[in-house]
């Protein structure tokens, strides 16, 4: 869980920017999107195989 404390004399926009940066660095949002819907293990394997094939070429 990312936590951001608003500093003294810091605007809300700056604090929000720092929060967004910390969330993107930790990969929290990407992980939530990935786990939004259940994915069968066979589908996971297929996607992983296709991604490896894409990287190879």
Swiss-Prot record:
A GO MF label: structural constituent of ribosome
Top-level taxon: Bacteria
GO BP, sorted A to Z: translation
Keywords of this entry: Ribonucleoprotein, Ribosomal protein
InterPro entries, per database record: Ribosomal_bS21, Ribosomal_bS21_CS, Ribosomal_bS21_sf
One Pfam family, short name: Ribosomal_S21
GO cellular component: ribonucleoprotein complex; ribosome
Protein family (similarity comment): Belongs to the bacterial ribosomal protein bS21 family.
Protein's UniProt name: Small ribosomal subunit protein bS21
